[in-house]
């Protein structure tokens, strides 16, 4: 195994730095000109090789994006695909037409746990198909950098170029600004008094199209004709003229008659309408697109929001074969219909004709999980440029000026053709639109209007015409789930294979004259159907009510404010956020003016309110860039309002009349819409238990077929008539494969979910519960999860002057009165006073708190820091005027009035007795005049501050110490900076650094215009704030329980690595004596490793660069593996470096890190997400528990995500716990194991019940007899159903065992004992049957007697089988280690007692009594009764001990899980 050396890693590292493209966010993607098809190739490649177990999805924004963005670490080193087909004729870029090829390098990395299961499409078709994606123009080079440009300049130098070197320059947004007429409508061209103009003849089609000017004076909606080409209009006029001339020849009486009958007035218009509709048919496609000949018959599409690959094929209906199909359905009494309903691909093969995508009448869509649907194609007149409906890609080079390219947005041209007909279909509430330019279906979820970069333009709102265009293109702004009608649900239920089999069985039983049994089963089936109907309607209604939202909004339309329904909003609309009617945001929008506070807990599970600020011009440029990559950056998210979030406060800025926002996404294209889709269409889990259950049913079906054949042979020997023989043989099938068998899978799960709900744990994905029983590794966030939510301030350490030696840290101050013991902030007499005053001011002002109804809202750390000061915080402060004496334009005036802004103010709290500051001193009133919010990429925030009547402006910055030290003047850093920092972090404390400076210009205007880059540069270091984060009391105990259960525990946090290690040790998560941390060698010599692993306590001790094993001191030899007791702690930058270029690094090296790391620190949200994926690659079943928005990506990616949130059901994770500690993890695992074992036991019980009845019936069939009608009823309804339900009521066992329950239903260790049990059942029925025939009181059965089944054979087998049903349930009701002992299941004990008592009672029943006659029993002797009792007791012990003992003899199947094989190899090395 080779260590990643400098010429492996360093090459990527140095080339990366030379390009200035550090990868700060793994979910981010580079927006370059790389082919969209190459992008999709990578996407498919990832999907086939990386197990994304979640749903498709930090500071709040990035986490929300993580819901629906694919996370990849692949660099752009995939082999170039070759071109496929002559595509240049379609006006497409060659790079966009390259086929989607699979990368062998990526395939060799690791096999996916969720391989594609395309059945309709072949793998070759999917691999070679042309493709599109919701990620337009993305090349998946994961060196994308979310860090703002100026921060890149600071880190990497100003002489280097960057792919994203500036928010404006070298970005797609820049090209948007130069060609912003694309995809939008110029205000000059769309309004005003100019008459409508025709654009002239389109060179592409030969048709002339309407310009359709959208005058604000026009109040009428477009008619259909206004969207129809001019040439077709002329044909319309000819039709109308012909109609007119025809009518003129009619007699006046005829005309009067026609008028009276309301026919003459519209007959001509009907012809026109029919003629227009005729042109919408696929046959006329070339008439409108002569230069865009369709060639592709199928395509592939990657839905990034759901991390889903789908195949799309185009078809038309063959009329001849459609008639044949309907005829076959009629002649087979609907059997063909049922088959094609259950197997829809047969319908496609029967009457579907393959056609090009553009000519489809309907499309076949299959996703990678084999889910198959058929969707109709919708065609409607549109007659607008392509860029108005689909994201436009061919933007001109930024170096060109708009005047040079001479393009107009509503002029069709070669790269932006007119779209006369909009060809669409809908899949999972996503609208797919055909692009003639690419000959592919695409989506417009992330469509942008280039005019958005100009805030002065967008603030004018839309015209009525543009709104109607966009409503046609994007649909209504509503998330309305189409609820099936009662008849539809009923129809689907009745035609489900389960109920069809039930109907078949009932008909069979009716023909066989089992009327009572058939009637009862029919009644139960009807009740079950209606119960399922009500449940489905309830669930769909709840989901629809949760997703649907409607309100009235005030919108700027045609430059006038009007009130409309929120469903009429379209991208680009300007609406009023401060409208009291709006309490929940109706769409995804960008805040344009004022500020507001929102609660995003419904989306993220994060209960901390989030502040939103008005967008700037830079924000809009970045928004355009972000939409191209579907990644909403933290920078943009500070102004981004997500659909479905609650507005806590919308504060109107002084001088403005309302808080305004612009709509950017609507309906299902919004973040909420994507999340609702993920709930309605959950990704199949692929859990082995469910796959095996159907294999198991198949196995039982083989037994049924065998029984069918044996019975037929036996009936022929007995000479039964054909009708009886056929009925009896078919009855065998209904017995061996009971229709209720699949339903038993959900019994245990439903009871477990109810128990979890009682504990405050809610689940939105029930299938994940059984998976939780198989968890191998559990990952935890630190702050708020393992530790308390609130941080307590331990104290502060101020940087003090140290004479000629520079600066040093003072003593730890735990009392705020020791920080600056003065009465006024202006009272400074020494350098130390100035330093202390400035540090104190940073504590007072550098935070993101907001005041709502007198309560402070914001980040808990900020809250604790400000609470430590004992001062007061007020917004909209007007008690005291803040003067700006050096304002150039407004000398000596009060600046809030000049600037129309009143600052937030901090001042001494007069109610605080410990306050030493003077209340009325103007210097003690600090106004926060500007804030630079915290960005997760920068890991810091800043504010600009001014005192009440001083002319000085300060800037203060706080953030991670290692980040703050980089932007400070080095001379101001204390000499013991690293030593003090290491001391605190090593002991588990959280450290925040503060810095500040005086701004060079003392004007209000300068404070509002100065860039963040300038504010956060050349700062004076001020000091540290030290927080202590106490462990939650349940943390250590829970972690110990997990470790005792052999479940690996991992901490995954954004905190400092030393703090994480300290907390890990305190919590017991780290139990090894040594912890090795990595460091990156920035200047390695040739061949030297870039990453060096050192002992955190003894840096001289390192790990071997090849094996990652401890190295002995002196001779550099590897220590004995038996003596190794260590773990690894990985930092985010190292994790990024390793897994970004994972194909270049030995797999063994990466596996060693993943297997031995207990701590992952300084991890970004996307890195947490990727860690889940990397662990899943080793075949771990991964759980993740977190409490905030930072963890949303990891919660969705993990096999089992548990969110600690106040929301009852957050879409952020499958499980949401109101228990705010990690003990809920134990509950989920316990109930998961109990549910899995219960489902397993119920499934086995139903199988053995079928086997017992099958053996009984087979023996009776051999004598030409059967069980009686009421005997079947007694067994099935009074014995089996109550037992199966009561079995499922067993609660979970308190202790979690080391061994995980098996989920393999078809392994030899399950099937062999099952077959032994079946043999024992047969043996213990066969012997009494043989013996009874020798009794003197023996009554022979009547051969073929349907009504009279009284016989000793029947009675004895009925009694014996009754006990077998009961005792089998007892044998299968296993208690510990996964469920409570059977004795604690009170309901089960009662049911078993009653059942045994009833069975004993039947044995003593008088056969001449009413009940005896009903059950058709015959008398047996008392001695034989005792024999049966003793015999069934022997049967019980035989079943209890024999199958398990045989199971123990079977060799345990070797685990195929990759991580287990690696651990076994390592154990072998240790033994050697």
Curated annotation (Swiss-Prot):
One of its GO terms (cellular component) is fungal-type vacuole membrane. The modification N-acetylmethionine is found at residue 1. Its EC number is 7.2.2.-. Keywords: Acetylation, ATP-binding, Magnesium, Membrane, Metal-binding, Nucleotide-binding, Phosphoprotein, Translocase, Transmembrane, Transmembrane helix, Vacuole. Mg(2+) binds at residues 1187, 1191. It is a multi-pass membrane protein. Residues 1-32, 71-115, 179-273 are annotated as: Disordered. The keyword Transferase does not apply. GO terms for biological process: intracellular calcium ion homeostasis; intracellular manganese ion homeostasis; intracellular zinc ion homeostasis; transmembrane transport. This is Vacuolar cation-transporting ATPase YPK9. It comes from Saccharomyces cerevisiae (strain ATCC 204508 / S288c). The lineage of its organism: Eukaryota, Fungi, Dikarya, Ascomycota, Saccharomycotina.
């Amino acid at each position: 195994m080779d260590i990643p050396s400098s010429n492996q890693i360093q090459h990527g590292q140095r080339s990366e730095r030379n390009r200035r493209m550090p990868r700060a966010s793994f979910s981010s993607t580079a927006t370059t000109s790389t082919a969209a098809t190459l992008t999709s190739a990578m996407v498919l490649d990832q999907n086939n090789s990386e197990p994304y177990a979640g749903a498709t999805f930090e500071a709040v924004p990035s986490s929300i994006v993580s819901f629906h963005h694919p996370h990849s670490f692949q660099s752009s080193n995939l082999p170039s695909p070759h071109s496929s087909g002559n595509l240049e004729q379609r006006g497409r870029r060659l790079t966009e037409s390259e086929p989607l090829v699979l990368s062998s390098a990526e395939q060799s990395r690791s096999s996916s746990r969720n391989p594609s299961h395309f059945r309709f499409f072949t793998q070759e078709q999917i691999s070679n198909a042309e493709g599109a994606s919701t990620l337009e123009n993305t090349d998946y080079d994961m060196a994308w950098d979310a860090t703002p440009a100026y921060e890149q300049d600071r880190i990497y130098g100003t002489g280097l170029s960057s792919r994203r070197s500036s928010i404006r320059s070298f970005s797609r947004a820049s090209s948007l600004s130069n060609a912003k007429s694309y995809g939008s409508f110029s205000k000059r061209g769309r309004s005003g008094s100019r008459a409508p103009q025709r654009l002239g003849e389109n060179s592409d089609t030969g048709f002339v199209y309407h310009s359709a000017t959208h005058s604000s004076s026009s109040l009428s909606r477009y008619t259909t004709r206004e969207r129809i080409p001019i040439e077709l209009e002329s044909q319309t006029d000819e039709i109308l003229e012909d109609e007119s001339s025809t009518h003129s020849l009619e007699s006046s009486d005829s005309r009067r008659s026609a008028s009276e009958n309301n026919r003459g007035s519209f007959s001509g218009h009907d012809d026109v309408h029919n003629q227009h509709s005729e042109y919408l048919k696929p046959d006329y496609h070339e008439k409108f697109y002569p230069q865009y000949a369709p060639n592709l018959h199928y395509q592939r599409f990657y839905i990034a929001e759901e991390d889903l690959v789908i195949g799309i094929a185009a078809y038309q209906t063959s009329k001849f074969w459609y008639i044949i199909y309907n005829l076959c359905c009629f002649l087979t009494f609907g059997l063909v219909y049922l088959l094609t309903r259950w197997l829809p691909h047969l319908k496609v093969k029967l009457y579907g004709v393959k056609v090009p995508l553009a000519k489809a009448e309907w499309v076949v869509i299959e996703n990678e999980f084999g889910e198959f649907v058929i969707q109709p194609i919708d065609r409607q007149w549109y007659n607008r440029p392509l860029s108005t409906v689909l994201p436009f890609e061919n933007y001109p080079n930024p170096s060109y000026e708009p005047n040079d390219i001479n393009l107009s947005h509503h002029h069709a041209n070669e790269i932006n053709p007119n779209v006369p007909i909009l060809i669409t279909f809908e899949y999972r509430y996503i609208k797919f639109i055909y692009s003639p330019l690419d000959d592919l279906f695409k989506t417009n979820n992330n469509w942008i209007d280039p005019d958005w970069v100009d805030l002065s333009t967008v603030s004018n709102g839309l015209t009525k015409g543009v709104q109607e265009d966009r409503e046609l293109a994007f649909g209504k702004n509503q998330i309305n789930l189409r609820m099936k009608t009662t008849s539809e649900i009923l129809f689907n239920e009745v035609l489900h294979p389960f109920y069809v089999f039930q109907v078949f069985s009932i008909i069979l039983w009716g023909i066989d004259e089992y009327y009572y049994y058939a009637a009862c089963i029919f009644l139960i089936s009807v009740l079950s159907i209606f119960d399922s109907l009500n449940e489905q309607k309830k669930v769909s209604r709840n989901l629809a009510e949760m997703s649907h939202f409607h309100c009235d909004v005030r919108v700027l339309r045609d430059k006038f404010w009007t009130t409309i329904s929120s469903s009429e909003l379209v991208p680009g609309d300007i609406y009023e956020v401060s409208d009291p009617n709006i309490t929940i945001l109706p769409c995804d929008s960008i805040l344009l003016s004022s500020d507001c506070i929102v609660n995003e807990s419904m989306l993220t599970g994060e209960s901390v309110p989030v502040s939103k600020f008005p967008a700037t011009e830079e924000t809009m440029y970045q928004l355009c860039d972000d939409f191209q990559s579907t990644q909403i950056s933290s920078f943009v998210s500070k102004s981004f309002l997500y659909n479905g979030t609650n507005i806590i406060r919308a504060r109107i800025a002084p001088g403005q009349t309302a808080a305004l926002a612009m709509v950017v996404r609507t309906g299902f294209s919004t973040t909420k819409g994507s999340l609702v889709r993920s709930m309605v269409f959950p990704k199949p889990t692929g859990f082995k238990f469910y796959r095996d259950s159907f294999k198991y049913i198949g196995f039982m079906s083989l037994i049924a077929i065998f029984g069918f054949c044996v019975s037929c042979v036996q009936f022929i020997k007995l000479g039964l008539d054909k009708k009886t023989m056929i009925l009896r043989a078919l009855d065998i099938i209904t017995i061996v494969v009971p229709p209720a068998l699949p339903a038993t899978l959900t019994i245990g799960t439903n009871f477990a979910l109810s128990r979890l709900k009682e504990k405050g744990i809610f689940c939105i994905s029930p299938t994940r519960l059984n998976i939780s029983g198989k968890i191998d590794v559990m990952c935890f966030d630190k702050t708020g999860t393992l530790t308390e939510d609130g941080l307590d301030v331990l104290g502060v350490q101020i940087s003090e002057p140290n004479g000629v030696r520079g600066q040093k840290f003072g003593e730890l101050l735990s009392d705020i009165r020791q920080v600056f013991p003065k009465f006024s902030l202006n009272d400074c007499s020494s350098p130390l006073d100035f330093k202390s005053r400035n540090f104190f001011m940073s504590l007072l002002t550098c935070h993101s708190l907001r005041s709502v109804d007198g309560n402070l809202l914001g980040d808990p750390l900020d809250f604790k820091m400000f609470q430590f000061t004992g001062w007061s915080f007020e917004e909209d402060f007007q008690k005291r005027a803040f003067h700006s004496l050096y304002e150039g334009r407004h000398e000596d005036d009060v600046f809030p009035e000049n600037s129309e802004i009143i600052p937030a103010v901090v001042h001494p709290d007069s109610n605080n007795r410990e306050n030493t500051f003077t209340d009325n001193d103007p210097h003690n009133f600090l106004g926060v005049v500007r804030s630079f919010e915290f960005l997760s990429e920068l890991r810091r925030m800043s504010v600009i501050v001014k005192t009440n009547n001083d002319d000085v402006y300060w800037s203060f910055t706080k953030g991670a110490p290692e980040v703050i030290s980089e932007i400070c003047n080095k001379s101001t850093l204390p000499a013991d900076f690293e030593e003090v920092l290491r001391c605190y972090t090593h002991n588990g404390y959280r450290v925040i650094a503060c810095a500040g400076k005086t701004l060079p210009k003392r004007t209000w205007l300068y404070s509002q215009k100065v860039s963040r880059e300038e504010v956060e540069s050349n700062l004076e270091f001020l000091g540290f704030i030290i927080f202590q984060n106490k462990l939650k009391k349940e943390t250590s105990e829970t972690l110990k329980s997990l470790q005792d259960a052999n479940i690996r525990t991992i901490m995954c946090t954004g905190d400092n690595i030393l703090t994480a290690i300290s907390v890990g040790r305190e919590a017991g998560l780290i139990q090894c004596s040594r912890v090795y941390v990595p460091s990156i060698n920035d200047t390695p010599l040739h061949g030297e490793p870039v990453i060096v692993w050192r002992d955190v306590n003894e840096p001289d001790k390192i790990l071997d660069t090849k094996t990652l094993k401890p190295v002995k001191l002196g001779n550099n030899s590897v220590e004995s593996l038996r003596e190794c007791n260590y773990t690894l702690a990985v930092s985010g930058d190292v994790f990024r470096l390793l897994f970004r270029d994972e194909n270049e690094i030995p797999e063994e090296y990466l596996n060693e890190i993943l297997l031995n790391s207990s701590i992952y620190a300084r991890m970004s949200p996307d890195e947490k997400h990727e860690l889940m994926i990397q662990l899943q690659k080793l075949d771990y079943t991964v759980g993740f528990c977190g409490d905030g928005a930072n963890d949303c990506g990891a919660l969705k990616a993990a096999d089992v995500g548990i969110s600690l949130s106040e929301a009852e059901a957050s879409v952020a994770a499958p499980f949401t716990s109101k228990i705010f500690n990690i003990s809920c993890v134990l509950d989920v695992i316990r109930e998961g194991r109990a549910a899995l074992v219960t489902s397993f036991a119920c499934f086995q019980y139903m199988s053995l019940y079928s086997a017992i009845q099958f053996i009984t019936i087979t023996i009776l069939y051999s004598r030409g007899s059967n069980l009686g009608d009421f005997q079947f009823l007694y067994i099935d309804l009074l014995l089996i159903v109550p037992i199966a339900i009561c079995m499922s009521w067993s609660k979970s066992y308190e202790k979690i065992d080391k061994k995980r329950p098996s989920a393999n239903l078809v392994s030899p260790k399950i099937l062999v004992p099952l077959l032994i049990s079946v043999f024992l059942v047969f043996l213990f029925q066969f012997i009494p049957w043989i013996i009874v025939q020798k009794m003197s009181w023996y009554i022979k059965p009547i051969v073929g007697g349907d009504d009279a089944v009284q016989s000793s054979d029947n009675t004895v087998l009925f009694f014996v089988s009754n006990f077998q049903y009961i005792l089998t349930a007892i044998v299968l009701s296993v208690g510990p280690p996964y469920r409570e002992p059977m004795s604690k299941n009170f309901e089960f004990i009662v049911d078993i007692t009653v059942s045994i008592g009833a069975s004993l009672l039947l044995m003593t029943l008088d056969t001449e009594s009413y009940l005896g006659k009903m059950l058709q029993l015959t008398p047996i002797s008392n001695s034989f009764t005792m024999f049966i009792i003793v015999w069934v007791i022997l049967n019980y012990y035989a079943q209890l001990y024999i199958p398990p003992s045989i199971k123990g003899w079977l060799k345990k199947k070797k685990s195929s899980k990759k991580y287990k094989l690696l651990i076994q190899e390592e154990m072998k090395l240790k033994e050697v």
